[in-house]
Swiss-Prot record:
The gene is mdtG. It is found in: Cell inner membrane. One of its GO terms (cellular component) is plasma membrane. The lineage of its organism: Bacteria, Pseudomonadati, Pseudomonadota, Gammaproteobacteria, Enterobacterales. This is Multidrug resistance protein MdtG. GO terms for molecular function: transmembrane transporter activity. It comes from Salmonella typhimurium (strain LT2 / SGSC1412 / ATCC 700720). InterPro entries: MFS, MFS_dom, MFS_MdtG_subfamily, MFS_sugar_transport-like, MFS_trans_sf, Mutidrug-R_MdtG, Tet-R_TetA/multi-R_MdtG-like. The keyword Transport applies.
Length: 404
């Protein structure tokens, strides 16, 4: 029996990739709480300069990830997804190690860009599982996998803050590098993939990739949906703490309250994603997608009228439960509308749109709040999500009419 004929235990692969996504999500978010403090430690002084450099080192990772993702996706379709997981985990571990040794802000900025270039563990994990899991279980599997990165991202800031308080800023980068190296070892020893490498000549070009899609217009609308989900999430991030302070008034534990309100959507998504993914397998991911978008609009609008932090926390928890269904539903629809031959590139294109949303969302939120106040951000974000709901519904309706 040849290696390519050996049956794959996709459930074991799902467990290991979930753990890998958890460690990657935790590793990325470990350093987030003190990023501005590390920028300051590297010699940046002055309020405006500190804000500018903090914004740059945060956003440049997503920008370079958006640029690099299609290249890595193409390579994954040629060489296999496991090797891309190994490349990503080891590359990020080395870069994190070097970040802990940075001597000035320019070195740190270049390393943050390099982190974006070498990243891509989670989209490649999605592509691997999407090509191995039975189609009728795609929603549940991708929903479950999404909880790995979410739970890692939730625990990461807490662990990072505690580690930084006890050991200092630089050691946290070394700890993060160790976490990513563990991710590399888990992938190397436990993930199995039957993949026959494809020669460069046999690879489909971009036009052929588009032509091979069952519904190119629908796939493009799914990419746009991913972008808008991230824009909607990111637009609130820059103003959340300030908005909570405005609602709470003069309280001593504002950091704790803000942190809790920031984290509740992730907790809700963690609970809802596998269940709604399973429901999507039963009734169709397109229905889950449209309903979740509409619910998001209905929850965003009242956020601009809340009077207490606890009202905001409740609405954000419900929003997180709806959001937990969105990206898995998009990914499941991408699986349904593409072939295994191009899965790496399709998921990498989706990641590029996600990264662009991660860059533009905070910029949009900051600009709106500066001009019209905090409450306007929620109304504008609701409008953007409503546009996306109508656009997605129209694209899915066209697809249904074409099938009929």
């Amino acid at each position: 029996m040849s290696p390519s004929d050996v049956p794959i235990n996709w459930k074991r692969n799902l467990t290991v990739t979930w753990l890998g996504c958890f460690l990657t999500g935790a590793a990325f978010s470990l350093v987030m709480p003190f990023l501005p403090l590390y920028v300051e430690q590297l010699g940046v002084t002055g309020h405006s300069a500190l804000n500018m450099w903090s914004g740059l080192v945060f956003s440049i990772t997503f920008l370079f990830s958006a640029i690099a993702s299609p290249f890595w996706g193409g390579l994954a379709d040629r060489k296999g997804r496991k090797i891309m997981l190994l490349r990503s985990a080891l590359g990020m571990a080395i870069v994190m190690l070097l970040m802990g040794m940075a001597q000035n802000i320019w070195q740190f900025l270049i390393l943050r860009a390099l982190l974006g270039l070498l990243g891509g563990f989670i989209p490649n994990a999605n592509a691997l599982i999407a090509t191995q899991v039975p189609r009728h279980k795609s929603g549940w599997a991708l929903g479950t996998l999404s909880t790995g990165g979410v739970s890692g991202a939730l625990l990461g800031p807490l662990a990072g803050g505690l580690l930084a308080d006890h050991y200092g800023l630089r050691p946290v980068f070394f700890i993060t590098a160790s976490v990513l190296f563990i991710c590399f070892l888990l992938t190397f020893f436990f993930i199995r993939e039957n993949f026959l490498p494809v020669s460069k000549k046999e690879m489909l070009h971009v036009r052929e990739v588009v032509a091979s899609l069952k519904n190119p217009r629908l796939v493009l609308s799914l990419f746009v949906t991913t972008l808008i989900i991230q824009v909607a999430t990111g637009s609130i991030a820059p103003i959340l703490t300030l908005y909570v302070r405005e609602l709470a008034g003069d309280v001593s534990n504002i950091a704790f309250i803000s942190g809790m309100i920031a984290s509740v959507p992730g907790v809700a998504a963690l609970l809802s994603a596998p269940r709604l993914g399973k429901l999507g397998d039963r009734i169709g991911p397109e229905k889950i997608l449209i309903v979740a978008l509409i619910i998001s609009v209905l929850l965003l609008i009242p956020m601009s009228f809340v009077q207490t932090p606890w009202q905001l926390a409740l609405l954000r928890f419900l929003l997180g439960a709806a959001d937990g269904a969105l990206l898995p539903a998009v990914q499941t629809l991408l699986v349904y509308n593409s072939t295994n031959q191009i899965a790496g590139r399709i998921f990498s294109y989706n990641q590029s749109f996600r990264d662009i949303g991660n860059v533009t969302g905070p910029l949009m939120g900051a600009a709106i709040s500066a001009s019209y106040g905090f409450r306007a951000v929620f109304c504008v974000t609701a409008g953007v999500v409503l546009f996306n709901a109508i656009y997605s519904w129209n694209s899915l309706r066209r697809r249904r009419l074409a099938i009929e």
